[in-house]
């Protein structure tokens, strides 16, 4: 790992192209490499995953080399301190016998770190893909009592009109994928932008959450 950091520093210092890079110019590469990690995981290829994780690490190292106010050592030190604080059941005297308790401790530690935040939505990256952002936002909404069930949302657009909606809902992730793809196909057929539509609904949900806080 130290050798990789040294290589990144040398490349940034001596390569005319790398030396001119900014964080903004590197951002698309980080997005692309992260997507390739996910693809390798989904493919179940350990060799591909090893390579793609290395590419993501390179982006981290190169961004640290570009930075003027911190080094990769600062990044690693801050990360270690944060993870120690968020795992008190490992590094301190807390006890966690279940995954649910681990999540409770994690969230408590994170809240303590982010005391300056005034909303549960602070820190949620708005640049996430719409589906991932929607799932994140719904989880944040639950924290302040703003709930939204799948059945209610389907009813709202009159896609399902039957009395017994439950049996019409997806029964697995595969079924959910079919449903989502069907909705995207519907949007395309009607000339709608599915991404824009979901982001618009997410913005409305964000307003509901902020009003509930």
Task: For every predicted segment, state its role.
Residues 1-52, 58-213:
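Flexible "arm" and connector segments at domain edges
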């Amino acid at each position: 790992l130290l050798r990789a950091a040294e290589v990144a520093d040398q490349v940034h210092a001596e390569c005319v192209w790398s030396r001119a890079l900014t964080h903004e110019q590197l951002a698309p590469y980080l997005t692309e490499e992260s997507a390739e990690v996910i693809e390798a995981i989904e493919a179940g290829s350990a060799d591909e995953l090893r390579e793609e994780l290395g590419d993501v690490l390179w982006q981290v190292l190169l961004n640290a080399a570009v930075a003027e106010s911190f080094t990769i050592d600062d990044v690693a030190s801050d990360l270690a301190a944060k993870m120690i604080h968020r795992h008190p059941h490992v590094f301190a005297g807390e006890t966690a016998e279940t995954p649910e308790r681990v999540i409770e401790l994690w969230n408590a530690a994170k809240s303590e770190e982010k005391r300056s935040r005034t909303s549960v939505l602070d820190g949620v990256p708005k640049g996430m893909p719409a589906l991932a952002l929607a799932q994140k936002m719904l989880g944040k909404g639950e924290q302040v009592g703003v709930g939204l069930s799948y059945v209610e949302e389907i009813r709202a657009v009159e896609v399902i009109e039957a009395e017994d909606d439950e049996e019409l809902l997806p029964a697995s992730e595969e079924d959910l994928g079919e449903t989502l793809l069907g909705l995207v196909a519907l949007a395309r057929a009607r000339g709608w932008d599915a991404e824009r539509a979901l982001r618009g609904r997410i913005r409305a949900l964000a307003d509901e959450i902020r009003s509930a806080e």
